[in-house]
Amino acid sequence: FPQRLFMDMKRLIINRLVGLGLLAVGILVSCSAPTAFVPVPSPNPWADDYTALSSMENYKQWGTYNVHDPACKKIGDTYYLYSTDAIFAENKEVAKQKNVPLGYIQVRKSKDLVNWDLVGWAFPEIPAEAVNWVRTHAEGQGATNIWAPYIIKHNDVYRLYYCVSAFGKKTSYIGLAESASPEGPWIQKGCVVKTDEQTPMNAIDPSVIEDPQTGRWWMHYGSYFGGLFCVELNPATGLTRQKNDYGHLIARRANYKKDNLEAPEIIFNPELKKYFLFVSYDPLMTTYNVRVGRADKPEGPFLDYAGHDLKDTTNNFPILTAPYAFEGHPGWAGTAHCGVWREENGRYYMFHQGRLSPENQLMVLHTREIFFNAEGWPVVSPER
């Protein structure tokens, strides 16, 4: 028996040594003769230049085209995406002549985040109260379209926040509509916040969160005129908890009265137990880019990765998206104003527009996966 055991051990050792020798040879061969990486062509089935489909009667073929300031939520097994009234080569007269059901706030849906169908428009017209406020306080200007919608569910009701403004002014109106369906019809519920040239803030770009830790509701909004603000909402109504409350400052930047800052998007990461505030810097048609801060509470204070408070008069980092171009492609500008969605499995996605260079007039939806690094900061995938 001892001799047999010895022979078995001897064979085992020899086999191990032979295996290690073969492994070493394999390593030497692989190191001495590396295989060159050969990329597999993966042509884009959709043309980035959609000029040929830009006529109003082609609206059912737009898919990811003509998307600006997107907000996305998954409802059941369907993703719904709402976006600003921004259409390349828009012509309301042609739309009317060809019976295009042109309205306000584009609504799309998808099963896979790749193939999108344009459902239509949320509203048949701009709410009269918003039009009256803006034009009365902006010398008859503005209120020609609806910007930056945001969708959130409360019990069995969907709440759609939106803004109406006069471009380049602080005269703006954030309104609320509700529906039993994400596709409408929508019932107007009134004004959340409205501003004019006398107020320090600008009532545009709403983003709303229900704090999962406290049940309180908060809306983040604003732009470069006075910065970004956070105001508490009444969960029962979706409007401000206190009448005529504008909230408190949460973000601005260096040269904040001149350099662009807008488009807050607030989310909660339950794994990190942090609230992330995504914001957009710079002109929307050129160097538009997304940055981010984080906080322990949805109302702030929000700090960047260097520990700077976003409401200080500094420029904050990191930068998550910016204009770029890959070889063989004209590139993208205006890659900002994002919406963010968290899947039940913990995966995160960012949605934003990109403007096709060099004219920067064609607007296409970009969807990227978000990853959080070891230090708890988000980064986004290079693929769209």
Task: Describe every region a protein language model picked out.
Residues 9-19:
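Bacterial N-terminal signal peptides that target proteins for export
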Residues 31-384:
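Carbohydrate-active catalytic/glycan-binding domains of CAZyme proteins
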Residues 19-30:
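Bacterial N-terminal signal peptides
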Residues 1-8:
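Short, Lys/Arg-enriched N-terminal segments with co-localized hydrophobic residues
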